[in-house]
UniProtKB/Swiss-Prot annotation:
GO terms for cellular component: basolateral plasma membrane; caveola; cytoplasm; cytoplasmic vesicle; early endosome; endoplasmic reticulum; endosome; lysosome. Transmembrane protein mainly expressed in brain astrocytes that may play a role in transport across the blood-brain and brain-cerebrospinal fluid barriers. Regulates the response of astrocytes to hypo-osmosis by promoting calcium influx. May function as regulatory protein of membrane protein complexes such as ion channels. Its main location: membrane. Keywords: Cell membrane, Cytoplasm, Endoplasmic reticulum, Membrane, Phosphoprotein, Transmembrane, Transmembrane helix. This is Membrane protein MLC1. InterPro entries: Membrane_MLC1. The modification Phosphoserine is found at S177, S179. Residues 1-37 are annotated as: Disordered. GO terms for molecular function: identical protein binding; protein-containing complex binding. It comes from Macaca fascicularis. Interacts with ATP1B1. Part of a complex containing ATP1B1, TRPV4, AQP4 and HEPACAM. The gene is MLC1. GO terms for biological process: caveolin-mediated endocytosis; cellular response to cholesterol; positive regulation of intracellular transport; regulation of response to osmotic stress; vesicle-mediated transport. Signal peptide: none annotated.
């Protein structure tokens, strides 16, 4: 009976040596969980089929309707100029819809400014059509053009409503203290080189467009129209602010600058595509000019309009790409588990690292001592 306590002390069914230094063995939990392991999957668990179907459907409908509207507007260039503008303004929304469909999260609310600005342009084109109908009712045939214009308006209205009603659902990793003490700009790489290259090309294209516009205005006073001055105005307004904002954001990325750049690009992209749609009649003029040989006496004006159209398309594409890159960075930051709304500064992050580092060093030292003791035994 007296040997039983000694047998209990010499038994090997007690706590392991590495676990003796811990105060509460029952509360021990591993640092990583099986759900935290990011396995390579083709279809993420947060994928939304409704968002994907809606994005593909809206993008397809907008592309088809814009294509028919551009064709009909170029068949009747003087009577249906409003239809070309409305069709051009809907192109960035269609591009963004296909971009959203490839994402694994609901990013439609991030493009809400672009959808609202496009809806404003289509509404203006509808008012433009009504004013032309009031001023000269006999010159406009209310047929397929009104159907296309109303269809564009309804599609954009549905897109705006869905973007306002949809909620941002993101797959956030459960990383414990990482979401509390880390900065999103330190975790997710910002596309600084891409935005810098975009800004350089935008400045060069804007200066070239201004010079080409001045030359086009001085070619012949009889052929110059008001559409040139309006187009140049939008180039000057839309090009340089977005280029400057892209360069500043690439140099010093932050939440505020990224949001401002998304807003500027979302506003300028539909306007540039609208001007491109208005000048699309120059393509038909160039085609008609090369049908007859020798060409017309005044081909330089139409060629300059075509070059201006290409510059506008380049500017519009770069602005749309800038918006997509910024939204992609924003979504990637949220997918990494970082808090986009409450962002900690460098001092808080440094304090968190200093607070965590002594604990890690203490754990390593204690584990090493336990190993040495076990080897000695």
């Amino acid at each position: 009976m007296t040997q039983e306590p000694f047998r209990e002390e010499l038994a090997y069914d007690r706590m392991p040596t590495l676990e003796r230094g811990r105060q509460d063995p029952a509360s021990y939990a591993p640092d990583t969980k099986p759900s935290d392991l990011q396995l390579s999957k083709r279809l993420p668990p947060c994928f939304s089929p409704k968002t994907w179907v809606f994005s593909v459907l809206m993008g397809s409908c907008l592309l088809v309707t814009s294509g028919f509207s551009l064709y009909l507007g170029n068949v009747f260039p003087a009577e249906m100029d409003y239809l070309r503008c409305a069709a051009g303004s809907c192109i960035p929304s269609a591009i963004v819809s296909f971009t959203v469909s490839r994402r694994n999260a609901n990013v439609i609310p991030n493009f809400q400014i672009l959808f609202v600005s496009t809806f404003a342009v289509t509404t203006t084109c509808l008012i433009w059509f009504g004013c032309k109908l009031i001023l000269n009712p006999s010159a406009i045939n209310i047929n397929f053009n009104l159907i296309l214009l109303l269809l564009l308006e309804l599609l954009m209205a549905a897109t705006v409503i869905m973007s306002a009603r949809s909620s941002e659902e993101y797959c956030k990793k459960k990383k414990g203290s990482m979401s509390d003490g880390t900065n999103i700009l330190g975790e997710v790489p910002f596309p600084a080189r891409v935005l810098k290259s975009y800004s350089v090309v935008e400045v060069i294209a804007g200066i070239s467009a201004v010079l080409g516009g001045i030359i086009a205005l001085n070619v012949d006073d009889s052929v110059s129209g008001p559409h040139l001055s309006v187009t140049f105005f939008w180039i000057l307004v839309a090009c340089f602010p977005s280029a400057i904002a892209s360069h500043v954001t690439a140099e010093c990325p932050s939440k505020c600058l990224v949001e401002v750049l998304i807003a500027i690009s979302s506003l300028t992209s539909p306007l540039l595509f609208t001007a491109s749609g208005y000048l699309s009649f120059s393509v038909m003029r160039i085609v008609e000019m090369f049908k007859d040989y020798p060409p017309a006496i005044k081909p330089s004006y139409d060629v300059l309009l075509l070059l201006l159209l290409l510059v506008l398309l380049l500017q519009a594409g770069l602005n749309t790409g800038t918006a997509i890159q910024c939204v992609r960075f924003k979504v990637s930051a949220r997918l990494q588990g970082a808090s986009w709304d409450t962002q900690s500064g460098p001092q808080e992050r440094l304090a968190g690292e200093v607070a965590r580092s002594p604990l890690k060093e203490f754990d390593k030292e204690k584990a090493w001592r336990a190993v040495v003791v076990q080897m000695a035994q």
